[in-house]
């Protein structure tokens, strides 16, 4: 370490520096998820096709039992596939993931430090050999994880083939088992994307803090209903990087941990401890002021009209077809006409509340936006996603106030936005989405 930021700031007047938590990049995680999903799909398709070749219609054979000769032929195919080198593919994915996460982390940490200390450390942190070493280690670790997805899948398929031979299973049963292994492998890949995104952000934040001499941090938990008790109780507490909590390690290190660290300078520690504003301001979901001329919400139908519809449950769980049919049944001409008057000739887009795959599957808002898009000739924009799961359906007022959703994504500039959801109880979700858009300086309307 060549720099000691706390020492440099020692002669400055002590004040509460409101450092922001450096959160993991949702866009980086989504990119990693998509890459791993494609990786698994290509692998499972290749294996299933390869297993069909020695026996012709192997997966179509319902009548015959599993023969030993089939097992030998299938094992040869698997062994040949296992020996094929996929290292470059794993390296490309891992490099892409880490480089994206590193760029976002570097920008946020540097900006955060500059805003609160007045010192631009961007170039110093970019050229640090220690951070480069950490980036290389994280890349190597993810290469091994991606390779393990493939090796573990092939091991399980080989085991399934041998067990089928021992039991004399029907070919159709083995085929179904192999397809199930593919689904399980995809779920593991999605877990890796989520887990490694948090770990990458946590490790790089720590490396950059330590590089400039920051030895302590304040634990910042997400404080939604998914946070573990052992993590929530640490919120606001100060820890040393050299002495991590024994039960959880540092924020982001535990599996699927979404907690983050806020830097603490030695000469600022007591002020931080006595100033709840520093952490609590960051806990509040993004909201914005309501101007007097802001358009009223257009509420189409009563709250129970959607929930009582026979297609509602399937649409809420992710059925695209049922969600679209539900939207066509519920969107009224009256609401469409009101929107036409509201929009006029403005350059508008439709932004529905929708979540990342890991957060939720409710397809109704997207389906409503699609129906409105066809009627209003306005494009749908899905670049903003709900980044936290709050599960407030049926919750009381206090529950909805405490658990407000957060959003992430790129906001299109110089357009008017019609934001919409499938239901509105107290308006918390739309208020959070509106606040996120306002923060990004996008003009907007509201449905």
UniProtKB/Swiss-Prot annotation:
InterPro entries: Phage_head_morphogenesis_dom (IPR006528), PRibTrfase_dom (IPR000836). To E.coli plasmid IncP-alpha RP4 protein TraN. This is Uncharacterized protein HI_1407. It comes from Haemophilus influenzae (strain ATCC 51907 / DSM 11121 / KW20 / Rd).
């Amino acid at each position: 370490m060549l720099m000691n930021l706390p020492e440099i700031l020692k002669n400055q007047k002590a004040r509460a520096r409101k450092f922001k938590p450096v959160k993991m990049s949702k866009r980086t995680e989504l990119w990693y998820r998509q890459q791993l999903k494609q990786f698994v799909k290509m692998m499972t398709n290749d294996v299933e096709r390869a297993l069909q070749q020695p026996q012709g219609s192997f997966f179509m054979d319902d009548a015959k039992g599993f023969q030993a000769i089939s097992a030998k032929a299938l094992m040869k195919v698997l062994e040949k596939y296992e020996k094929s080198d996929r290292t470059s593919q794993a390296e490309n994915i891992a490099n892409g993931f880490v480089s994206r996460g590193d760029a976002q982390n570097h920008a946020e940490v540097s900006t955060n430090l500059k805003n609160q200390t007045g010192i631009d450390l961007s170039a110093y942190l970019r050229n640090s050999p220690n951070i480069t070493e950490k980036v290389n280690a994280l890349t190597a670790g993810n290469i091994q994880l991606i390779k393990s997805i493939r090796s573990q899948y092939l091991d399980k398929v080989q085991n399934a083939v041998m067990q089928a031979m021992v039991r004399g299973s029907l070919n159709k049963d083995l085929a179904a088992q192999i397809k199930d292994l593919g689904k399980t492998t995809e779920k593991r890949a999605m877990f890796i994307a989520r887990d490694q995104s948090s770990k990458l952000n946590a490790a790089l934040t720590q490396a950059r803090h330590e590089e400039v001499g920051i030895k302590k941090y304040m634990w910042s938990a997400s404080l939604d209903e998914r946070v573990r008790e052992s993590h929530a109780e640490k919120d606001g507490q100060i820890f040393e990087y050299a002495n991590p909590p024994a039960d959880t390690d540092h924020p982001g290190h535990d599996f699927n941990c979404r907690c983050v660290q806020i830097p603490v300078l030695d000469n600022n520690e007591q002020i931080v401890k006595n100033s709840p504003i520093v952490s609590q301001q960051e806990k509040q979901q993004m909201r914005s002021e309501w101007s007097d001329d802001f358009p009223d919400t257009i509420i189409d139908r009563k709250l129970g009209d959607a929930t009582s519809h026979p297609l509602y449950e399937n649409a809420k769980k992710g059925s695209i077809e049922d969600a679209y049919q539900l939207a066509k049944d519920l969107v009224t001409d009256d609401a469409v006409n009101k929107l036409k008057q509201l929009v006029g000739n403005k350059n508008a887009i439709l932004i529905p509340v929708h979540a990342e795959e890991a957060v939720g599957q409710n397809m109704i808002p997207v389906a409503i936006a699609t129906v409105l898009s066809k009627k209003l000739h306005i494009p749908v924009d899905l670049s903003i996603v709900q980044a936290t799961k709050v599960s407030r359906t049926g919750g009381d007022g206090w529950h909805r106030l405490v658990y407000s959703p957060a959003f992430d994504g790129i906001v299109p500039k110089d357009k008017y936005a019609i934001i919409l959801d499938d239901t509105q109880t107290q308006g918390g979700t739309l208020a959070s989405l509106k606040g996120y858009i306002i923060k990004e300086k996008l003009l907007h309307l509201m449905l």
